């Protein structure tokens, strides 16, 4: 094998290991919610790159990302947090269950704001309007993580 091919093979292997280690042996409902959060994060990053000008702006892709985020939010997200599901490597704070109405409110707000982002992108709304909707949605993620995610 050529040295350059070997380096690419090693790099690809390390990259794949990083993804596997990211969930550090999570199983069951903890893995399901970590996978859902990873999917949300991937879509948020995709839209963020477009709105920052680091990737070509594509309203169809933004609408698709909004739909994907909405699909993981609201009741779907809430069901991923049954009481006593703090098995390692969960990053969920026990305060979720003490402040359930606030937590579920964030989940519902994420769904609503992601649906709004999707709708605006589908309608061909001005990029600044889409960016404002994205900012609101991302702000919901940030607020929820600050309140209910254990800091690494």
PLM regions: where:
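Bacterial N-terminal signal peptides
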Residues: 8-16
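Bacterial N-terminal signal peptides that target proteins for export
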Residues: 1-9
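Acidic, low-complexity intrinsically disordered regions
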Residues: 4, 17, 93-96
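Sec/Tat signal peptide C-region and signal peptidase I cleavage site
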Residues: 17-24
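Sequence context surrounding c-type heme c attachment/ligation sites in exported
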Residues: 24-60, 65-152
């Amino acid at each position: 094998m050529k040295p350059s091919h070997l380096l690419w093979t090693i790099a690809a292997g390390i990259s794949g290991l990083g993804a596997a280690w990211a969930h550090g042996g999570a199983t069951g409902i903890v893995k399901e919610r970590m996978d859902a959060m990873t999917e949300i994060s991937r879509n948020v990053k995709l839209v963020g790159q477009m709105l920052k000008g680091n990737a070509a702006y594509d309203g169809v892709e933004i609408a698709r990302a909004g739909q994907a985020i909405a699909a993981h939010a609201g009741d779907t997200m809430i069901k991923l947090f049954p009481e006593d599901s703090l098995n390692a490597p969960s990053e969920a704070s026990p305060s979720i269950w003490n402040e359930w109405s606030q937590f579920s409110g964030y989940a519902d707000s994420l769904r609503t704001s992601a649906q709004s982002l999707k709708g605006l992108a589908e309608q061909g709304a001005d990029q600044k309007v889409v960016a404002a909707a994205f900012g609101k949605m991302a702000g919901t993620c940030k607020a929820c993580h600050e309140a209910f995610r254990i800091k690494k």
